[in-house]
Amino acid sequence: GLPVGGYTAWLERMAADDRIEVRLDTDWFDVRDDLRRQSPAAPVVYTGPLDRYFDYVEGRLGWRTLDFELEVLDTGDFQGTPVMNYNDPDVPYTRIHEFRHFHPERDYPSDKTVIMREYSRSAAADDEPYYPINTETDRALLSAYRARARQETAAARVLFGGRLGTYQYLDMHMAIASALNMY
């Protein structure tokens, strides 16, 4: 299930802790040397693409990305569920989200609903990666990157997490469990 108030409220409460510094529009690779000099023993949780962390030294891992299409429909309920997945070869999108069903306790207009379609495609170098690709080539690269990640964790206290940092498909409950198990 969802946290009370949704993930945004949950993350806002965590980020409000005085021990947490939040930097927006900041690329880790632009600030990491300064941050490591300031706090060399501090652990780092890296959740970006695993291959990018190591400057693609083993090669580029394959990723899928998503394009989104938002639409307001003139109906009070489009699909009766928060997310409907589609794997039919003749359907161009992979899923449809209908946001009103994530929080049924809230009041919504009875004559309108908002949906979002997700379209999956191979990620180009400048796209935001979302999902790992499980090919033989990617598995070989991943093995080499995981060996590097283990060394980096031991030497520099860098913890690799999330879908991108572990190159794993993770549902939210799996990502949360993985983060809790890091410590």
Regions found by a protein language model. Name each.
Residues 1-13, 23:
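Short beta-strand to alpha-helix junction loop
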Residues 22-24, 46, 160:
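A structural signal for the hydrophobic beta-strands that form the central parallel beta-sheet
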Residues 26-148:
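Mid-domain catalytic core of redox enzymes
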Residues 22-23, 55, 166-168:
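Domain-scale detector for complete catalytic domains at protein termini or as standalone homologs
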Residues 152-168, 175-178:
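Short FAD-binding loop at a beta-strand-to-alpha-helix junction that anchors the flavin cofactor
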Residues 18, 40-42, 155-156:
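Short, well-ordered alpha-helix to beta-strand connector turns
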Residues 15-29:
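A conserved beta-strand/loop element that lines the FAD pocket in flavoprotein oxidoreductases
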